[in-house]
Amino acid sequence: MSRYIYIILFSLALLSSCANLGGGPQGGPRDTIPPIVEKESPINGTLNFDAKRIEIHFDEYIQLNDIQKNVLISPPQQKAPEIKAIGKTLSVVFAEELTDSTTYTIDFGSAICDYNEKTPLLEYVYSFSTGDVIDSLAISGRVYDAGNLDPIAGVLVGIHTNSADSALNTIPFVRITRTDDNGYFTIHNMRSGKYRLFALNDISRDYLYQPGEAIAFADSIVEPYIEKREQLDTIWRDTIGIDPETKDTLFTRQ
């Protein structure tokens, strides 16, 4: 089984709201099928990536929903790329130079929706590498509220290779993700190594710790790895986890 890191944030309350969009007269069955990717240029998983622009073509007209909140680029960039939807095409234009020999991941979250019903395309991730390989390790876990132990949705989770405490205030995370509605997270496309793991209520959206933001951090170094434990019909199934010596506790910083 995969090992999980359980992260507890101190005194963090996140509010969520929902609206009933089903009231009023109905014009027929609601289209619940999300947009389908028909073509990617360059293709998803490209190696030695050197393009400035990505275009993704869909089978229907699309629109974008709150890209600042829903789209995460890892490693994070200081200058946000320009992301637009025109007709059936989504474009991403980078505003800064990409780092050599680095795996990049664009997680669109629920940002891509069909034009009429706003049905989101979930779990669509575009990855590429500016080097010869796409890093493929990962760390998974869950974030809880320290006050009531409820799972927390929408919290930024990131890793650092720099062990200095000042890195939190001065250096953006190496890789990032957000917790889902049930507090679960997975940081994908990690390279092997030793990392410090953090959960951050990133109110400022700068991928840095600022005074007043709730934060939690692991009390030991984490090392991602891939285990092969289950054998089904002579084919091994990979499971992703963390070093068994890694403790599952995090402390909070106020």
Task: Give residue spans per PLM region.
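Acidic, low-complexity Ser/Thr/Gly/Pro-rich repeat segments typical of extracellular/periplasmic
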Residues: 18-182, 186-189, 194-198, 212-218, ...
